[in-house]
């Protein structure tokens, strides 16, 4: 999903968020 880094941190476990150039984030755990 598309989100800000703050939203991504809230959605993912600590240290798991990856954000690409288009600011789409995934939880990499």
Curated annotation (Swiss-Prot):
Disulfide-linked positions: none
Keywords, in A-Z order: Disulfide bond, Secreted, Toxin
Entry PTM: Contains 4 disulfide bonds.
Annotated Gene Ontology cellular component terms: extracellular region
Subcellular location: Secreted
The keyword Magnesium appears for this protein: no
Superkingdom, taxonomy of origin: Eukaryota
Tissue expression: Expressed by the venom duct.
GO molecular function: toxin activity
Domain statement: The cysteine framework is XIII (C-C-C-CC-C-C-C).
UniProt name for this protein: Augerpeptide hheTx3
Source organism per UniProt: Hastula hectica (Sea snail)
């Amino acid at each position: 999903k598309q989100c800000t880094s703050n939203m991504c941190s809230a959605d993912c476990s600590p240290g798991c968020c990856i954000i690409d150039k288009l600011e789409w984030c995934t939880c990499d755990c």
